Amino acid sequence: MRSKFKDEHPFEKRKAEAERIRQKYSDRIPVICEKVEKSDIATIDKKKYLVPADLTVGQFVYVIRKRIKLSPEKAIFIFVDEVLPPTAALMSSIYEEHKDEDGFLYITYSGENTFGGFETA
């Protein structure tokens, strides 16, 4: 899936920003969170997040739900490299496995399970 953030910011600029963030906040992970293009779920107001390394995927999903004001009965799915990461996984381990060459972790979210795959821990 194409990232609007990648389209809007050149690679060198993204890489420099991620490196600066990692140096300044070594216990945090630079995350770009974007909606899957054709999803009918609300669009998030902020794409860039500085996430504590010890946050779980489930806790991050909670943050996203709050930001898009998603009601409890509505589903949300987040994807890393088009795969659903385990809810209990730490963001730091997801980052180490899936970070982009620019240093950011790219996460997409949708109101439906658009890709269908699950990652097993």
Swiss-Prot record:
Lipidation (Phosphatidylethanolamine amidated glycine): G116
UniProt KW Membrane keyword: yes
GO biological process: autophagy; protein transport
UniProt xrefs under InterPro entries: Atg8-like, Ubiquitin-like_domsf
Feature type site, description Cleavage: G116, G117
SUPFAM superfamilies xref list: Ubiquitin-like
UniProt membrane topology term: Lipid-anchor
Annotated localization: Cytoplasmic vesicle, Cvt vesicle membrane; Cytoplasmic vesicle, Autophagosome membrane; Vacuole membrane
Gene3D superfamilies registered for this protein in UniProt: Phosphatidylinositol 3-kinase Catalytic Subunit, Chain A, domain 1
Result of knocking out the encoding gene: Exhibits slightly reduced growth on nutrient-rich medium, and displays a severe reduction in conidiation. Leads to the loss of pathogenicity on cucumber cotyledons. Is defective in the early stages of infection-related morphogenesis, such as in germination.
Proregion span(s): 117-121
Entry function: Ubiquitin-like modifier involved in cytoplasm to vacuole transport (Cvt) vesicles and autophagosome formation. With ATG4, mediates the delivery of the vesicles and autophagosomes to the vacuole via the microtubule cytoskeleton. Required for selective autophagic degradation of the nucleus (nucleophagy) as well as for mitophagy which contributes to regulate mitochondrial quantity and quality by eliminating the mitochondria to a basal level to fulfill cellular energy requirements and preventing excess ROS production.
Assembly and interaction partners: Conjugation to phosphatidylethanolamine (PE) leads to homodimerization. Interacts with ATG1, ATG3, ATG4, ATG7 and ATG12.
Name of protein: Autophagy-related protein 8
